[in-house]
Structures are given as C-alpha cells and as structure tokens.
Regions:
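Ribosome-associated RNA-binding proteins
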Residues: 1-177
Length: 177
C-alpha cells in the first residue's frame, strides 16, 4: 500500500472542490484547475480534507494511487498559495527584461531571444539578472522555467548561464599547462 496515498489532503474554507464523472475540480483565489482521475480510484471530499481511495480494495493497488494524491495536493496548493521559481542569469552582458507577455533575453548570442510567456505564468524582473516566475500550475511553471533555462544552461568552467536560485553548479578545473 502506498504511504503517500494513505495521507489526507487538508483544504481550507476558501477552496471549493468537487469530484464528478471521474474528474476532480478545484477553485481558489488564484484560479481553477481540473484533473482527470483514473476510473480505478475515487476522491472522497469532506468539509476539511480529501482522501483518494481505490474503488476495489481487493485488487492490485498500483503506484498511480500515490501519484494521483500528489497531483491533487499540488492543485490544492496551487489554487490557494501558488508556486514560484527564481532564475538567475550569470555572465557578462546577460540580462532579461519583460514587456507585456514577451520575455526578452540577452544571453551573449548575436541576437536577442524573445520568449512568449504562457498566460498562466506571471513574470517579474526585479533586476536585470533575475527572473521571478509564479503560477498556480506547478506543471506549467516547471516547464516554463526549464524552457527559459534551456536557452543557456550553466557551463561548468566559468558558471555562465541561466540557473535556478539555489542550484549548485559543479565547477571543473580548466586545462593545465
């Protein structure tokens, strides 16, 4: 039996949840999200907590049970608090600026990179070398941050590139004479 799946998910009064026709719905102050749930499981919603349970207790319980519980937990946290990631640009002349929904990146190429940010993600550039991303969807936020980081991954010799806020870049020694 999955240890994660046995735990309940606490919900606050400001979030409304329902489970209909194999789909979980959640609505909070930051937005609303849905999740299709496998037919082998159902979601039991009480006033202040949620349980994910298998429909057939005697059958083989597979790893999807804990995954579904974690996805629902992320949805609840997303619509109530939201998620955020911070990216740092390290390198001479590396900068970022935002205009509307276009993120303009100068990363040492002969041209600027214009990245169209998804509407679910909010972007801020408090400094020229810092990008703050926030969203109610952990999946979209992670994909957006990974796509921005992929334009110039940190290299191990000088550490130049785009990295996550607390990411450690393993440094290598250069050539020896």
């Amino acid at each position: 039996m999955s240890r994660i799946a046995k735990n309940s998910i606490k919900i606050s009064n400001e979030i409304s949840c329902k489970f209909e026709n194999g789909t979980f719905f959640a609505k909070g102050k930051l937005g609303e999200m849905t999740l299709p749930v496998d037919s082998e499981y159902f979601v039991d919603i009480s006033s202040d907590e949620i349980f994910v349970k298998p429909r057939n207790e005697k059958g083989k319980l597979n790893p999807k049970w804990g995954t579904i519980r974690s996805l629902i937990s992320n949805i609840i946290k997303g619509v109530s608090e939201g998620f955020s990631k911070t990216l740092e640009l390290n390198g001479t002349g590396y900068r970022a600026s935002i205009s509307g929904s276009i993120l303009k990146l100068q990363l040492g190429f002969s041209h600027d990179i214009n990245y169209s940010v998804p509407k679910e993600v909010k972007v801020e550039c408090p400094k020229q070398n810092i990008i703050k991303l926030s969203s109610y969807s952990k999946e979209i936020l992670g994909a957006t941050a990974a796509k921005i980081r992929s334009y110039r991954k940190p290299e191990p010799f000088k550490g130049k590139g785009i990295k996550y806020e607390n990411e450690f870049i393993f440094r290598k020694e250069g050539k020896k004479k």
